[in-house]
């Protein structure tokens, strides 16, 4: 069994013909968050994926096998919620509330996309958005600071959270104090934009 153990950096330009000839490995978002997994290429060949911890694969990424061959990553269609709104402010409000919950979100021109979740779907409808369940590839935003989403109250997280609480409190006309001085040493990391640990940690 071949092992895919290197990812070519996104800024490295490969010849289009080389990439076009490479077999594809189609994975859903959850699988693309895993740095170690057994998978099957679209050609039917079984392979092992062994990448640095924290790696999150995106559609179009190119991996290198231990024999030097290239494999192209494709985002598999999966069940997602497609969120639209009649005006930009409503969509922004929806994005804000999803961000408060550390929900992975794909942001597109006039829409948000997230993994299917009936509780979040209900919340989004209450906010005035149109929510449709559909089957499509899911490519959420990567971490804004490049290092991936941390389940920890590090300095950046604490500052962002305090600011979000302040904005939330002002918007609702009351101060919503939440003290995060307590020490939660949860600095494990799933990679840019990957936050599946909120529904049960799956460390690979």
UniProtKB/Swiss-Prot annotation:
One term of GO molecular function: unfolded protein binding
Family: Belongs to the UreE family.
Keyword NADP: no
Protein's organism: Burkholderia orbicola (strain AU 1054)
Region (Disordered): 172-204
Subcellular location: Cytoplasm
Classification via SUPFAM superfamilies: Urease metallochaperone UreE, C-terminal domain (SSF69737), Urease metallochaperone UreE, N-terminal domain (SSF69287)
Name used for this protein in its record: Urease accessory protein UreE
Gene Ontology BP, a term: protein-containing complex assembly
Function, as annotated: Involved in urease metallocenter assembly. Binds nickel. Probably functions as a nickel donor during metallocenter assembly.
Alphabetic keyword roster: Chaperone, Cytoplasm, Nickel, Nickel insertion
InterPro entries: UreE, UreE_C_dom, UreE_N, UreE_N_sf
Chief localization: cytoplasm
Bias type Basic and acidic residues, positions: 172-190
GO cellular component, one term: cytoplasm
Domain of life: Bacteria
Pfam families assigned: UreE_C, UreE_N
